[in-house]
Structures are given as C-alpha cells and as structure tokens.
Amino acid sequence: MSLGPLKAINDKQLNTRSKLVHTPIKGNTADLVGKENHFKQTKRLDPNNDHHHQPAQKKKREKLSALCKTPPSLIKTRGKDYHRGHFLGEGGFARCFQIKDDSGEIFAAKTVAKASIKSEKTRKKLLSEIQIHKSMSHPNIVQFIDCFEDDSNVYILLEICPNGSLMELLKRRKVLTEPEVRFFTTQICGAIKYMHSRRVIHRDLKLGNIFFDSNYNLKIGDFGLAAVLANESERKYTICGTPNYIAPEVLMGKHSGHSFEVDIWSLGVMLYALLIGKPPFQARDVNTIYERIKCRDFSFPRDKPISDEGKILIRDILSLDPIERPSLTEIMDYVWFRGTFPPSIPSTVMSEAPNFEDIPEEQSLVNFKDCMEKSLLLESMSSDKIQRQKRDYISSIKSSIDKLEEYHQNRPFLPHSLSPGGTKQKYKEVVDIEAQRRLNDLAREARIRRAQQAVLRKELIATSTNVIKSEISLRILASECHLTLNGIVEAEAQYKMGGLPKSRLPKIKHPMIVTKWVDYSNKHGFSYQLSTEDIGVLFNNGTTVLRLADAEEFWYISYDDREGWVASHYLLSEKPRELSRHLEVVDFFAKYMKANLSRVSTFGREEYHKDDVFLRRYTRYKPFVMFELSDGTFQFNFKDHHKMAISDGGKLVTYISPSHESTTYPLVEVLKYGEIPGYPESNFREKLTLIKEGLKQKSTIVTVD
C-alpha cells in the first residue's frame, strides 16, 4: 500500500507515539533539543568555516554529544523498561547505545542530551528529524521504533544494524568489486526513490550513513539534515551536507536553491568512492574540495580500472547541471547494471572480496530483477515507463501532423551512531577491478551486446528535432546514417586486423562543421553558423535560408518529393519579396551569434570544399546534440563540451576540445591509439559508442500512415 507525500513541517507539537511501543515524549516538548552543533543544516555556510577544517580556535568548542551523560542501566518509560547495553558510537550531537527490552529484543538508542537544548529552533529540528524518520517505512531504510525521554536525555529507538556501515566496509577492503557495488546501488536507489516519492530529500547521503543489517542488506539512516518539500517545485536554500558529498548547486545556489537532485549527486560520489577507494573530489582542505566540486574536477585513475559502462554512469550522475542528472528510474536502465549481479552479499564481505565469476548472465538478470523487487523499485518504475510510453506515442502523433517534435525533456554527522559496528573513533569521510572476462561463445556475446544496445537506446530519447515532411528526405537521411555507421564498423574491423598501411589511410580533410548555434524553434527555428562563416536558419516549416559569407548571395532550400531537397540561388539584391522576412530573421541571428557566441573551432573554408553545405536535421538528445549536414558529415556536441564529427563515410573523425582545439584523424588510427592523441580526457570510446547508437536509431525510417 503506497503512502501519500508528507506534509510540510509546521510548528505544531509532534505526536511521537509509535505503533510498536506506546511511550510518548513526556513533559514540555520545549525542553527537547536539536542538533545545534550540526550548524550546517541551518546556517548559510561560508565554505571557509566548515567545522571539519576550521583553524584552531582559542578555545576548542566541546561537542554537544559530550553533554549526553551515560543513561542509567535501567531506562524506565511509561509502560515499558529498557536495559542499557554497550556504547555503540557518537556523532556531533548524540551518542548511541545498545538497549534491550524485557523480551530480549535489541535496539539502537540514539541519545540526545537535554542540556544541549538552547532554543526553539533546535527543538524544531529534532522534532523534524523524528517526524520524517518516523514516517519512513522501507526495507532499505533504518526502521524508526519509538521516541521517549527521561530527566536528562531524549531517546530515539531505532532498528539495530549489527554489521557496520559502507564506510567501515571501504576502510577495511580499500576498494570493492563492481558486482557487489551493483547490488548496493540498487538497494540505495530503492530507498532514495521511496524518500523522494514522499517529497523527502535526505541531504546527507554518504557511506557513513548507510548501514548493514544482519543479512548484509543496506539501510539508510540519520535523517538529521532531511527536509520535506511542500510540493514538487519547492526549493531549499540552506547550505548543508558533508564536504565530499555536497552537490554543486548547494554550494552555488543561494538564489536558485536545490531539490531532489542533491541525493542523486551523493549517490554518484558514493558509487565512485566504492569502486575507486576515495571520493572523486577528495583534497586536503575543504576549500579545495568545494572548488573541485564546482568545476566537476575529477578523473578515473589508471591504476584502478573500472568498466566503461561504470564510468558512463558515474559521469552522467555527476553532472554539474541538476537537470542533466539521470532520474533513479533512468539510472536503473543503464548498461552497467546488466553485468554480473549477485543474489546476496556474503557475511565474509567485510574481510575479503566475494567471487561472483561463476554467475551466468541469465542468472545475473534474474538476481537484478529480484533485488529491484525487494527494494520496491519495480512498481514505481513500471508507472514511470507507462508515462514514458505515453509521451513517446504523443510525440509520434505530433510528427505525423507535421508539428515540431517535443519529447519529455525532456561536518561529522553521526557516522556510526546508528550501528553497533561503530566506535568512538571519528571516521574521516575520505574514501583490471573486474577483469574483462572472455565470453564462452559468440552467441553469448551477441546476447549481451543486444541487451546493452537496448538499454542504450533508452538513453537516447530525442528531446527535440526538426520535422522532416518528405518521405524521400527521410530515406536519404537514413541512408547517410547507415553508410556512415557501416564506415565506423568497417574501421573497427580494420583496427582488429592490425590497422591499415599508411598508403591506404584516407586523406585528411577537415569537414565543414557547425561552430555556433541557437535553438529558437519555439518561435522561428534553428539558427547556425558553419566553419565557412555561412549563416543558416532552419525554419519551423522545414525550409532553410543559407546566407553566404563570401558573396552577397543566399540559398533558399525546401523539401522536394523527388529529390529530397531543392535549392534555389539568389543575389541579395534580387531577393524575392516573400523571402524578405526570412532574411531579416537570418540577419537577426547573425548579429546575435556574433555578439554572444564564440566559434568552437578555427576551421575555415578549404579548397576542397567545393559545394555549399546546409544543415538537414538537428536532434537534441540528453548526452549530445546531433547535426546532419548535407555533405554527409555528422557532428556531435556532447554535454561535457567535447565535440566530435564523423565524415568521409565514417572514415575520418574530427575532435574539437572544450578549449576549441581542432584536429582530424583517420578513425582506424584513433581506434589503434585508443583515444584522441593528446586528449585522454575526451573519453573517445564512450562517445563513439553513443555516436554509433545515434546513427543506428536514425538509420531506421519511421513512417506514419
């Protein structure tokens, strides 16, 4: 049974009576204390004043948890007594003890000293944490049991997690294998998906706040920084979190705020840390960490290889723009999850890496589905997919009636106090793995490839494109895509056979590319500037005006049922009256791009550029924008500001760096080298995989009766 979203926290006193143990908070609730030394959840932080990294003060401030006295051996409440057991750990404002009821059941008691209560504000914070945690009911979230108080302390009773945290696991093992991280990530995604469905943002997801139960399933705990949104569009503005895990929009969003995406970012940080051994933005001081986060300055060390599929997932999650991060549903569709997937985590995981090599592909898929079911992911994902199918259907209808296609754009915080695996030690949040296995036969390799391509196709959902009215035009475009895709596949085959002799390498010719563009399709159309300085506008009605840079002339291009496109050439001085408005729009965009946009390349017109070129089609995907030019060149502008163009029927690849450096190579030579020479940060192979899938999709002609 699904629960509705939580209501926003208000000032009314909370009823903390649990259904399991009827022991309400007694006395004046104004005496309750909040996490005051957890200053990050309330103060608008200057990054220079993080309490993890503050310079030495004249007088060291005592942690508020130190005010918490050891509870009596027998803790009496109304209707039920508890026997105090071992000390489990402490955080910034609370201490945690093991306690046992009369039946012998053991719990973790998060204990907050009343002496640390200084204001109504801190009381409300503690009540907020209690209310939010009490409302959570998910197999991968630490269960809230009860809340009560005595004369000295407030006690929050929680499900006990006897096997430590992910932080402890990483400290012991140094680095984890991809199969176990797939398992952990799936469970974490299930818990986050549930929280977000209740409009709850955790805001402090980190390895130290995720615990192991008795069966080594994960449980998210510590809701001290959690917030409830009144509605889906509400934003939060408090700078809070743990330095290594904090999202860039939290650091930079004083005016724009942050929302659910901060938890997605933290997931990406944890994923990287588990596979590499430390957080991606780790540095000696907090200011450097913050600067690296704001610049998305991280890389994958060569001495700790992870799969390309894992890198793609991490890079996408750690997108600077929150809107560009994949949703939890989209994350579960990534190819990476189709790798080896265990049925469970063995009890020896804390001391040694599990061996899952014998799990067959088919069983891995079964295990993955089973894990999603247990984490309550499948039900919510299925409804998301229904909505996605509706959007795709509506989009196909739009294209059939010749409209523009628009698709759905598309501080130490209690690191161990919920787990008896913790100690008094304050954890520091710093934190070929899976050798490539040979497949037994070609059939199995083909099955895996098909499964990966199916998932990749889901990533490449167009968010906008120009409408192609002519069926012959669609066939020409599909043929060009097919030709270029075959050229790439042929180059890959040549590379596997040892490459080509220099005499057979294709001659280097820099293609004409799009150097500037403006998408104004909500009114006029799509404007662009080519490396030849020619300016074009692809209007919403499908026609194009291309104004030449080296002559007072222009082309007017429209669809043709026999040729695909037909182009008419005019002198500017002899322009037809009906095209005057078109040229005014071209001039407007030319001035706009000159004033506001910089060229992405130094390429210009070469002597081998005999014909004028225009843009036939553009398509905006989440990973990149794809341009299809009339000379058969395909250009891909990726969201990380790297650009690639495939020309000469797939034989040549052009790379443009974020700093506008441009170079062209035979594709087979780049494949042989393994990356764009001199540009290891280009992530060439990952981008080529996306390019091939984009071309493959466009090779299929979709017609509507």
Swiss-Prot record:
<dbReference type="GO" id="GO:1903353">
    <property type="term" value="P:regulation of nucleus organization"/>
</dbReference>
<dbReference type="InterPro" id="IPR033695">
    <property type="entry name" value="POLO_box_2"/>
</dbReference>
<dbReference type="GO" id="GO:0000776">
    <property type="term" value="C:kinetochore"/>
</dbReference>
<dbReference type="GO" id="GO:0004674">
    <property type="term" value="F:protein serine/threonine kinase activity"/>
</dbReference>
<keyword id="KW-0723">Serine/threonine-protein kinase</keyword>
<dbReference type="InterPro" id="IPR017441">
    <property type="entry name" value="Protein_kinase_ATP_BS"/>
</dbReference>
<dbReference type="InterPro" id="IPR033701">
    <property type="entry name" value="POLO_box_1"/>
</dbReference>
<dbReference type="GO" id="GO:1904750">
    <property type="term" value="P:negative regulation of protein localization to nucleolus"/>
</dbReference>
<dbReference type="GO" id="GO:0004672">
    <property type="term" value="F:protein kinase activity"/>
</dbReference>
<keyword id="KW-0808">Transferase</keyword>
<dbReference type="GO" id="GO:0106310">
    <property type="term" value="F:protein serine kinase activity"/>
</dbReference>
<feature type="domain" description="POLO box 1">
    <location>
        <begin position="513"/>
        <end position="595"/>
    </location>
</feature>
<dbReference type="GO" id="GO:0000086">
    <property type="term" value="P:G2/M transition of mitotic cell cycle"/>
</dbReference>
<dbReference type="GO" id="GO:0005737">
    <property type="term" value="C:cytoplasm"/>
</dbReference>
<keyword id="KW-0498">Mitosis</keyword>
<keyword id="KW-0963">Cytoplasm</keyword>
<dbReference type="GO" id="GO:0090306">
    <property type="term" value="P:meiotic spindle assembly"/>
</dbReference>
<dbReference type="GO" id="GO:0051301">
    <property type="term" value="P:cell division"/>
</dbReference>
<keyword id="KW-0677">Repeat</keyword>
<dbReference type="InterPro" id="IPR000719">
    <property type="entry name" value="Prot_kinase_dom"/>
</dbReference>
<dbReference type="GO" id="GO:0019237">
    <property type="term" value="F:centromeric DNA binding"/>
</dbReference>
<dbReference type="GO" id="GO:0005935">
    <property type="term" value="C:cellular bud neck"/>
</dbReference>
<dbReference type="GO" id="GO:0070194">
    <property type="term" value="P:synaptonemal complex disassembly"/>
</dbReference>
<comment type="similarity">
    <text>Belongs to the protein kinase superfamily. Ser/Thr protein kinase family. CDC5/Polo subfamily.</text>
</comment>
<dbReference type="GO" id="GO:0000922">
    <property type="term" value="C:spindle pole"/>
</dbReference>
<keyword id="KW-0547">Nucleotide-binding</keyword>
<feature type="binding site">
    <location>
        <position position="553"/>
    </location>
    <ligand>
        <name>Zn(2+)</name>
    </ligand>
</feature>
<keyword id="KW-0067">ATP-binding</keyword>
<feature type="modified residue" description="Phosphoserine">
    <location>
        <position position="419"/>
    </location>
</feature>
<feature type="binding site">
    <location>
        <position position="569"/>
    </location>
    <ligand>
        <name>Zn(2+)</name>
    </ligand>
</feature>
<feature type="domain" description="POLO box 2">
    <location>
        <begin position="614"/>
        <end position="700"/>
    </location>
</feature>
<dbReference type="Pfam" id="PF00659">
    <property type="entry name" value="POLO_box"/>
</dbReference>
<comment type="subunit">
    <text>Interacts with CDC48; the interaction is likely to result in CDC5 degradation. Interacts with CSA1.</text>
</comment>
<protein>
    <recommendedName>
        <fullName>Cell cycle serine/threonine-protein kinase CDC5/MSD2</fullName>
        <ecNumber>2.7.11.21</ecNumber>
    </recommendedName>
</protein>
<feature type="binding site">
    <location>
        <position position="612"/>
    </location>
    <ligand>
        <name>Zn(2+)</name>
    </ligand>
</feature>
<feature type="compositionally biased region" description="Basic and acidic residues">
    <location>
        <begin position="41"/>
        <end position="53"/>
    </location>
</feature>
<dbReference type="Pfam" id="PF00069">
    <property type="entry name" value="Pkinase"/>
</dbReference>
<feature type="binding site">
    <location>
        <position position="110"/>
    </location>
    <ligand>
        <name>ATP</name>
    </ligand>
</feature>
<dbReference type="GO" id="GO:0000712">
    <property type="term" value="P:resolution of meiotic recombination intermediates"/>
</dbReference>
<keyword id="KW-0206">Cytoskeleton</keyword>
<keyword id="KW-0418">Kinase</keyword>
<dbReference type="GO" id="GO:0010696">
    <property type="term" value="P:positive regulation of mitotic spindle pole body separation"/>
</dbReference>
